[in-house]
C-alpha cells in the first residue's frame, strides 16, 4: 500500500509544475508595477506614460493570446513571459534608483565650508634671508607639528591679521586659536593684505591668519608671486558657510522665465562658495518661448562690491566673501535679481569634461597658449587639460580677456552638445557617477525634472543668443585689496544696458535674433 501511495504523491507533484499562465500573471503584475513607476517619475510627461502604457498593453495582449492558445507547459511561452516580467521588474526598480542619483546631485549641497589657514614662512625661505630671520628672533619648524608649534609658543607668537578685509573668517580663526592655546593670542591687525604679507616676509609678525580664498589674490601682487612656495601652513580651521538663497523648488520653471549664474572659481580641490570667479556667465531662459541668452561679463569688471558698502572692486573678487555677494553685485549691475547659481572649480571642471569623454567645438582662430598647447582653427577635440587651458587662456588671444569669455561660451556649447548626443545619453549613468560632488548649486532636482519633462513633451527647438561684454582696461585700487593698484576692466555702459535689455526681452517672451553688441561707450 505504501508503494502505491508514493506513486500517487509523485504523480501529484508533476501536476503542480508552474504553467505559462502563472508566468503570464507575473508579467501582468510586473507591467502594472513598471507603468506605475514610470508614471511617478517626474522627468517623464504624461504623453510618454500614455505611449508606454499603450505599448505595454499591446505586449500583454500578444503574450496573453499565445499563453491561451499554446499548451500551459509550453517552455518557449513560459520563458518569454518570465523574461519580460524580469525586464519590467528590473526597469521599475532601476528608474527610482537613477532618479535618486539625480536628486542627490542637485540637492545634496545647500552650503559648504571655507578654510582659514595659519601661514608661516618656510624654514627654507628663512635660511635664505638671514637679514630678517636668525636664531635669536625666529621660531624654526624643523618638521615639527604646526599645531604643536602654535601651542608651545602661544605666549610669544605675533599673529598678523586683516580683520577689515575678511572679518568673519578672521574672527572665527582667532577664537579657535584662543580656545586651542588656552590664552588670548597676540595680534597685529593690518589695513590691507599686502601690508600683512609684507610684515610676515620681514619677520615683523611670526604667522599670518588668512582664508585660502585670498592666496590667489596675494600671488597677483608683484613681489609675492611665490607666496605659496615661500610659506607653510601650520594649521587650518574649517568654517561652515551657508547660502542666503534657497533651492529653486518650484516646477514653475518649466513655464516661467528664470536666470542662472554659472561661475567657475579659480581654486583647486573641493568646492567652496567662497572664492574668486574666473568665469562669470549669466544664462537667461524662457521655456515657454524657447529662448536662451548666454551673457559673459569680464572677470575684472570694476563694479560696486556690496560687502564693502558699494566701494568698487573687481567682479572676480566679490566671490571672496561668498557667492551670495557676487550675485548681489551682478543683480545691481544688470538690474535683474540673481539668486540661482551653478558653480564649479578647476578640478571639478576637468572631472566633468573627463566624464563626458572630452568635448568638440569650433575654434574661430589658431593660437598657442602660454603653457605651449597649440589650438588649431576649426573643429577641435579637447581633453580635460586642454579644455581647462582653453577657458583660462587670455594672454595669447587677439582680444585678451574678452576673447576668453567667448571661449567659455564655446565650451559651454560643447558640453551641451555632448550631453545631448547619443553617446552622452548612452553613458548618462557613468556621467552622473563621475560628476557627483563636482558642482555646487541651489537648482533643485524638481526644477530639472520639470524642464526635462517639458523638453520631452514638446521637443523645444531652443534659440540661443550669446554676448560677451567688453570694456576698457585700467589700474585701480580695489575694495578687497586696498593700498595696491590692480588691473581692472571698465565695462561699457552701452553694452551693459544692451544685455540688460536682452534679458528683459527673454523674460518678456520675445523671439531673439543674434545681434552685434553696440559700440562701447560710457554715460
Model segments located where?
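Terminal targeting segments of Actinobacterial cell-envelope proteins
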Residues: 1-16
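Membrane-embedded alpha-helical segments of integral membrane proteins
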Residues: 18-67
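Cytoplasmic membrane-interface regions of multi-pass membrane proteins
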Residues: 66-75
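Internal/C-terminal transmembrane anchor helices
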Residues: 74-97
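Non-catalytic, solvent-exposed segments at the cell envelope interface
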Residues: 103-212, 216-523
Amino acid at each position: 500500500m505504501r508503494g502505491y501511495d508514493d506513486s500517487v504523491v509523485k504523480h501529484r507533484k508533476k501536476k503542480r509544475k508552474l504553467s505559462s499562465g502563472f508566468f503570464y500573471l507575473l508579467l501582468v503584475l510586473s507591467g502594472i508595477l513598471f507603468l506605475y513607476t514610470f508614471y511617478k517619475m517626474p522627468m517623464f510627461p504624461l504623453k510618454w506614460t500614455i505611449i508606454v502604457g499603450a505599448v505595454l498593453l499591446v505586449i500583454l495582449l500578444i503574450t496573453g493570446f499565445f499563453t491561451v492558445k499554446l499548451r500551459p507547459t509550453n517552455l518557449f511561452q513560459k520563458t518569454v513571459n518570465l523574461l519580460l516580467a524580469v525586464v519590467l521588474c528590473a526597469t521599475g526598480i532601476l528608474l527610482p534608483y537613477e532618479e535618486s542619483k539625480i536628486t542627490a546631485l542637485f540637492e545634496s549641497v545647500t552650503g559648504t565650508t571655507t578654510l582659514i589657514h595659519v601661514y608661516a614662512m618656510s624654514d627654507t625661505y628663512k635660511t635664505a634671508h638671514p637679514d630678517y630671520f636668525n636664531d635669536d628672533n625666529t621660531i624654526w619648524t624643523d618638521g615639527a607639528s604646526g599645531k604643536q608649534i602654535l601651542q608651545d609658543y602661544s605666549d610669544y607668537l605675533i599673529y598678523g591679521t586683516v580683520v577689515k578685509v575678511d572679518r568673519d573668517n578672521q574672527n572665527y580663526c582667532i577664537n579657535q586659536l584662543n580656545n586651542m592655546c588656552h590664552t588670548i593670542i597676540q595680534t597685529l591687525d593690518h589695513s590691507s593684505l599686502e601690508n600683512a604679507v609684507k610684515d610676515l616676509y620681514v619677520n615683523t609678525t611670526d604667522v599670518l591668519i588668512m582664508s585660502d580664498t585670498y592666496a590667489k589674490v596675494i600671488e597677483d601682487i608683484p613681489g609675492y608671486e611665490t607666496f605659496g612656495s615661500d610659506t607653510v601652513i601650520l594649521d587650518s580651521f574649517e568654517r561652515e558657510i551657508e547660502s542666503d538663497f534657497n533651492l529653486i523648488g518650484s516646477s514653475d520653471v518649466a513655464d516661467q522665465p528664470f536666470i542662472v549664474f554659472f561661475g567657475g572659481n579659480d581654486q583647486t580641490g573641493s568646492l567652496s562658495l567662497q572664492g574668486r570667479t574666473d568665469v562669470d556667465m549669466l544664462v537667461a531662459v524662457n521655456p515657454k518661448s524657447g529662448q536662451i541668452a548666454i551673457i559673459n561679463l569680464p572677470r575684472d569688471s570694476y563694479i560696486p562690491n556690496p560687502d564693502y558698502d558699494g566701494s568698487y572692486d573687481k567682479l572676480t573678487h566679490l566671490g571672496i566673501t561668498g557667492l551670495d555677494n557676487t550675485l548681489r553685485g551682478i543683480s545691481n549691475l544688470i538690474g535683474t535679481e540673481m539668486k540661482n547659481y551653478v558653480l564649479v572649480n578647476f578640478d571639478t571642471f576637468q572631472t566633468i569634461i573627463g566624464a563626458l569623454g572630452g568635448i568638440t567645438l569650433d575654434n574661430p582662430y589658431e593660437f598657442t597658449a602660454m603653457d605651449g598647447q597649440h589650438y588649431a582653427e576649426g573643429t577641435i577635440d579637447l581633453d580635460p587639460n586642454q579644455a581647462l587651458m582653453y577657458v583660462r587662456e587670455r594672454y595669447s588671444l587677439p582680444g585678451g580677456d574678452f576673447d576668453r569669455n567667448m571661449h567659455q561660451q564655446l565650451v559651454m556649447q560643447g558640453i551641451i552638445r555632448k550631453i545631448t548626443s547619443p553617446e552622452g545619453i548612452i553613458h548618462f549613468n557613468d556621467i552622473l557617477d563621475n560628476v557627483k560632488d563636482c558642482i555646487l548649486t541651489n537648482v533643485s532636482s524638481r526644477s530639472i525634472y520639470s524642464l526635462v519633462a517639458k523638453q520631452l513633451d514638446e521637443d523645444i527647438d531652443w534659440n540661443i543668443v550669446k554676448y560677451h561684454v567688453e570694456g576698457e582696461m585700467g589700474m585701480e585700487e580695489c575694495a578687497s585689496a586696498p593700498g595696491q593698484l590692480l588691473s581692472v576692466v571698465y565695462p561699457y555702459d552701452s553694452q551693459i544696458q544692451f544685455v540688460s535689455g536682452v534679458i528683459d526681452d527673454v523674460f518678456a517672451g520675445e523671439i531673439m535674433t543674434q545681434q552685434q553688441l553696440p559700440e562701447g561707450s560710457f554715460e
